[in-house]
Design a protein with these regions (language model features):
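Hydrophobic adenine-recognition pocket in adenosine-nucleotide-binding enzymes
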Residues: 9-10, 72
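Core AdoMet radical
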Residues: 2-3, 23-42, 58-75, 88-104, ...
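Short, acidic Gly/Pro/Ser/Thr-rich loop/turn segments
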Residues: 11-13, 28
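Short, electropositive alpha-helical surface patch
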Residues: 80-87, 155
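Cys/His/Pro-rich metal-binding microdomains
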Residues: 11, 19-22
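Generic structural signal for well-ordered alpha-helices
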Residues: 45-52, 79-82, 108-112, 135-142
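Alpha-helix boundary/capping residues
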Residues: 25, 51-54
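N-terminal [4Fe-4S]-dependent radical SAM core
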Residues: 1-7, 14-17, 53-61
Length: 155
């Protein structure tokens, strides 16, 4: 599997959309502008070109690509990025913490769209938000797709 970070910032405390960055020096100066917080489809395209030119990476990517990061679903471009990486592999996954306020959030809509495009959503479960936010959405994710990887965190 090839794991690709598509999100520079993550703030799981502002659950549905990123509002500020908590990444610290030495990365902070390049993240002052929000345009650098998220990978773009153009950057994803450049990465795909590079991956295709490095045989071991290309072989790994063909098996599986995992889109991850601080919180990949906060990237407003994630559906388009997913489509770009699908040109490299039929097996593209997205990892999320599923710490989302509701089914009406943009993050949830992005996850649903990726499952419609035959992507798989994998999640990390946290006891601190399990009952309030993750449990209701986990059942919905399971209905949208066949199989998933679940990481459990004990806090």
């Amino acid at each position: 599997m090839l794991s690709i970070f598509v999100e520079a910032s993550c703030n799981r405390y502002v659950r549905d959309e990123c509002r500020f960055c908590h990444v610290y020096a030495p990365l902070k100066p390049i993240l002052e502008s929000r345009e650098y917080w998220h990978m773009t489809p153009d950057t994803a395209g450049l990465m795909v070109e590079k991956i295709r030119s490095v045989e071991p990476l290309k072989d790994l990517a063909k098996k599986e690509i995992n889109l991850t990061g601080g919180e990949a679903s906060q990237n407003p471009h994630i559906v388009e990025i997913y489509k770009v990486f699908r040109t490299l592999s039929d097996n593209v996954r997205l990892h999320t913490n599923l710490d989302i306020n509701s089914e009406k959030s943009k993050r949830w809509e992005r996850l649903v769209e990726i499952t419609r495009l035959r992507g798989r959503i994998d999640i990390t479960l946290y006891p601190t938000v399990w009952e309030s936010r993750q449990q209701p959405l986990l059942g919905k994710i399971i209905k949208l797709q066949n199989g998933l990887i679940v990481n459990l965190i004990y806090e």
